[in-house]
């Protein structure tokens, strides 16, 4: 006797716990459950996936993996990687740490001068954004070893406005304060009047 359709079955993959509940990119996440040896991929919020080849360890009851820098807060998904995959969602959202943007100084600054940004977990910052959409990537600012301070040169064409941090996960972290850029003022030109091909001198504040 033969059946008309193939008989298939699947193991009851389950998630019992995900720890720690709050985690920073680069740290090891532990997932406990059953039949986890069948999992080929762990998917974080917004489709950020870690394949089993990158797992730190895996058994039937537990998976350990490092959280990728692109990961964002949200539920995680376990997938068996089949053509029609079995996907199991965590009950609770995983809280992925973002940079904390405490303050910046000075709040009034001349373009070309150095701005100091303070906070926590600033090693997760990929870019600093100034008013006018001026972006400074991480290879153009300095970060202290504690990850609590960034020093960045204000672009010459930066506008007044907010200073934002762009995390490596793509999330924008705001501070709420406004940066004011100092422009040249009190300008004077000598000699006045002037003839063609004559050298002039411009004086003023914040030149």
Regions found by a protein language model. Name each.
Residues 1-207:
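Ser/Thr/Pro-rich low-complexity tracts
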